[in-house]
């Protein structure tokens, strides 16, 4: 893989971002995927430094004040941010980097790093997105309703992105993302 630098992947909750990124990493372990910091508590099975860097609100605020994030935003009542130093180190070393972040974070990265490639992952249909979110069985109807309200806003913003990938098949979506990352 010839690295093109930084690729930012965004899309609504339930569209399959984690699954597509995992498929990319499975075939291309040389792609570095940023580990975000968050104030949300770890879920069962999550390990600090693997899925997220888990920090308390005070530490997160300190990191924001110190300029340690490329982007940061509130989502679902918790703060999330992309640590600046590891990203810049990998980019300087020529490592292809992938950020999987939400819309507000993507907008911040576009302001700070406009040379990045911005990719929006979209569901085949809104009904399919509803099916995926409800099929998880992990969230209350109220949380799902909030996520769907947010998804409508995010879907309306897809024109802000350089490319749109419809995730109707994980392997195809991952292959398309890799093709965009290497510029083919």
UniProtKB/Swiss-Prot annotation:
Residues that hold ATP according to the record: 11-18
HAMAP family linked: Guanylate_kinase
Gene, per the UniProt record: gmk
Matches recorded under InterPro entries: GK/Ca_channel_bsu, Guanylate_kin-like_dom, Guanylate_kinase, Guanylate_kinase_CS, P-loop_NTPase
Keywords: ATP-binding, Cytoplasm, Kinase, Nucleotide-binding, Transferase
Enzyme class at the top of the EC tree: transferase
Name recorded for this polypeptide: Guanylate kinase
Intracellular or extracellular location(s): Cytoplasm
Annotated NCBIfam families: guanyl_kin
Example GO molecular function: guanylate kinase activity
Family assignment from sequence similarity: Belongs to the guanylate kinase family.
Organism field: Frankia casuarinae (strain DSM 45818 / CECT 9043 / HFP020203 / CcI3)
């Amino acid at each position: 893989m010839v690295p093109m630098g930084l690729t930012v992947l965004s899309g609504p909750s339930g569209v399959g971002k984690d699954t597509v990124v995992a498929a990319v990493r499975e075939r291309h372990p040389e792609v570095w995927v940023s580990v975000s910091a968050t104030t949300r508590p770890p879920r069962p099975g999550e390990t600090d430094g693997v899925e997220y860097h888990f920090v308390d609100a005070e530490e997160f605020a300190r990191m924001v004040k110190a300029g340690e994030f490329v982007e940061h935003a509130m989502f679902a009542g918790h703060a999330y941010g992309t640590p600046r130093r590891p990203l810049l180190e990998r980019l300087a070393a020529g490592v292809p980097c992938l950020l999987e972040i939400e819309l507000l974070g993507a907008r911040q990265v576009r302001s700070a790093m406009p040379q990045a490639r911005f990719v929006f992952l979209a569901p085949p249909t809104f009904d399919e997105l509803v099916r995926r979110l409800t099929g998880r069985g992990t969230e209350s109807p109220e949380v799902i309703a909030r996520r769907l309200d947010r998804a409508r806003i995010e879907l309306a913003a897809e024109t802000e992105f350089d490319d749109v990938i419809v995730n109707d098949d994980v392997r195809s979506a991952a292959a398309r993302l890799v093709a965009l990352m290497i510029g083919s």
